[in-house]
């Protein structure tokens, strides 16, 4: 690959919100799993995943990943102040060692 084609990874700060706008459904499973793992590592006990309202494809993938993840204590669609049905709030089981 020539120097002009090299893509450098970008370090993105992890907060309590993951915005999936612009990502393809095929990318979402891995993104959600990595995000939840990072939240656990950083001690972020709860957060929100913005999947958009659309036809629900990303929402279904996000909810499926949250259901499968043993570190997830609970999750629900956002309320009126946190994105409504275009976002999902979650709580993690924090390891208090």
Where are the regions a protein language model picked out?
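Long, charged, low-complexity intrinsically disordered regions
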Residues: 1-97
